[in-house]
């Protein structure tokens, strides 16, 4: 897997997903020299946005990241709405962490 964070963000943007970029990649865009190996976002929680996010994740080939093999499942708006806090995903372009209720 090659880490292509801009490819992940382009797909989210192409689907009209409203989100805030946070974490290490956001810091790198602001000049931080610290390395990062994932993209962290906080998506807007309205149903339409979660539907668009689900479509973007499908287009990215996102799977649920686990301690072992990633789990393939249907990730749609209803699935995302049921997530209480966080969802860790992997894509062919790198890992993507969704935070639904940031601290």
Label each region the model flagged.
Residues 1-103:
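Compositionally biased terminal segments of proteins
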């Amino acid at each position: 897997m090659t880490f292509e964070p801009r490819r992940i963000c382009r797909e989210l943007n192409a689907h009209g997903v409203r989100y805030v970029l946070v974490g290490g990649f956001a810091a790198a865009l602001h000049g931080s020299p610290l390395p990062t190996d994932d993209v962290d976002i906080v998506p807007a929680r309205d149903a339409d946005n979660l539907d668009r996010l689900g479509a973007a994740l499908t287009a990215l080939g996102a799977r649920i990241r686990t301690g072992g093999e990633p789990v393939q499942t249907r990730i749609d708006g209803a699935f995302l709405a049921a997530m209480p806090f966080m969802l860790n995903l992997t894509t062919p372009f790198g890992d993507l962490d969704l935070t639904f209720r940031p601290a």
